[in-house]
From Swiss-Prot:
InterPro entries: DUF1444. Transmembrane segments: none annotated. It holds the Pfam family DUF1444. Belongs to the UPF0354 family. This is UPF0354 protein GWCH70_2742. It comes from Geobacillus sp. (strain WCH70).
Length: 265
């Protein structure tokens, strides 16, 4: 299954007269837009293909459901008032757009050299990124939204799975609620994990549905983390970054891991 074939399969499943499809061969993406609203979603095809090799039709079913939910929701009018408990931060790569297709600035903060924090209104099966127009219409200021979002992400349950490889311990947060990567902003949780770690603490957010925390004891641990992060990055529906981060004194610093060597970016 290559990108062109996957593109055709998704188009066949989503065939509707009121939607348009644009395959970008260079970026390896498929954009689906509503003809009326001009709003839509962009799918990273390599991630879907990687999942297809493991899950076959289930991987396509998942992305089709995601697109249908997202585009159908775009016809609805959404408000922030009364929805305070549904506002969350989401982590995205620095290549992610900073404005909507209509040129409206999105609300975001710089996070690391590899990531940004955007703010979203949770809609159940999907979400809407908060933009400046939405804020102005409801007379909400940036700080109010950011404060609420940070509080809400700290309130999310955190279920951690553990795996050991060659003396190194890897912890995974993978609840698939759309905010696993966002839990990297839960500072009390990171501080709690830091107390458990006896080696070097590293973090990774390869895609939106996983947070990896590593207790690195030797060079093998760095190699395993790099391979693991790249694998998750390649298979994620919403990829973020294939780089990992050292966690020191509450700060995140991107690192390159090459073979048995690593260096700070």
């Amino acid at each position: 299954m290559d990108s062109k074939q996957m593109c055709e399969e998704i188009k066949k499943r989503l065939a509707r007269d009121d939607w348009t499809f644009q395959f970008d061969r260079k970026k390896d993406t498929l954009r689906i837009e509503d003809k009326e609203t001009k709003k839509g979603v962009t799918i990273s095809l390599p991630g879907v293909i990687a999942k297809w090799y493991e899950q076959k039709d289930e991987a396509v079913d998942e992305i089709v459901y995601y697109v249908e939910q997202a585009l159908n929701t775009m016809h609805e009018k959404h408000t922030l008032s009364g929805k305070e408990k549904d506002i969350y931060p989401v982590i995205r790569s620095t290549s992610f757009p900073t404005e909507t297709k209509e040129g409206i600035p999105l609300l975001y903060d710089e996070h690391t050299a590899e990531t940004r924090i955007y703010y979203a209104l949770d809609l159940g099966n999907t979400y809407r990124l908060i933009d400046k127009k939405m804020m102005e219409q409801e007379q909400w200021n940036e700080e109010r939204i950011k404060e609420i979002a940070r509080f809400n992400v700290r309130s999310l349950d955190v279920h951690v799975k553990e795996d050991k490889v060659a003396g190194n311990t890897f912890y995974f947060v993978n609840t698939n609620d759309g905010y696993d990567a966002s839990r990297i902003l839960n500072e009390p949780f990171l501080a709690k994990m830091k107390k458990k770690i006896t080696g070097t603490m590293a973090l990774a957010v390869p895609h939106q549905d996983v947070l990896i925390i590593a207790d690195l004891q030797n060079e093998v641990g760095y190699d395993v983390l790099a391979q693991m992060t790249m694998s998750f990055f390649a298979s994620g529906r919403v990829p973020i970054t294939a780089l990992s981060f050292l966690y020191e004194d509450g700060e995140l610093e991107p690192i390159f891991i090459l073979g048995k060597n690593y260096r700070k970016k």
